[in-house]
Regions:
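Membrane-embedded alpha-helical bundles that constitute the cytochrome b-like, heme-associated redox core
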Residues: 2-163
């Protein structure tokens, strides 16, 4: 038992603990840009669905539906994993997770993006309610994401001030 406990309490080098705190914010800024790109792709899909004739043919050639699905899938996976990574790094560095608005809104963003992705089977069947709900949820996600960027910068500034 003592051997198992010593393995669980491996010492993490201080430099790793310090620099690991910056992984989450860097990834999140990339994901914010990715989310905006996913919105652009989604709007192009909607535009192609409503277009007619040559305009529709040109839009279909852009394969926006495939790109949107792929970008959305990567966004879902990386956003979810990165949220848990951030909590783990915070716990390793401070021995606790700070219960504040940044954590709560971050968990809401993860919950909303998972809910949005769960609408895919309904959207593939052409259900407009699912498409509209998907768009509405993701506009909300982008708004919360922007707010998270602001509070995240404040968190990073606090970390830097303590170095």
């Amino acid at each position: 038992l003592q051997e198992k406990l010593s393995i669980m309490s491996l010492a993490i080098p201080e430099s790793v603990k310090v620099w690991s705190q910056f992984i989450h914010p860097i990834i999140m800024w990339v994901l914010l840009v990715t989310a905006i790109y996913a919105l652009y792709l989604g709007l192009k899909i909607r535009q192609s669905r409503n277009a007619e004739g040559e305009a529709k043919k040109e839009l279909i050639k852009g394969r926006y539906n495939i790109k949107h699905y792929q970008v959305g899938s990567v966004l879902l996976a990386v956003l979810t994993l990165n949220a848990f990574l951030a909590m783990a790094v915070t716990y390793v560095n401070h021995g606790k997770i700070f219960f504040g608005s940044h954590l709560i809104v971050g968990l809401i963003v993860v919950s909303l993006i998972v809910t949005s992705a769960s609408l895919s089977p309904f959207m593939q069947r052409g259900n407009m309610w699912a498409r509209n709900l998907h768009l509405a949820i993701n506009i909300g996600v982008l708004g919360l994401f922007g707010w998270q960027a602001i509070t995240g910068v404040q968190v990073v500034q606090k970390i830097i001030s303590q170095l």
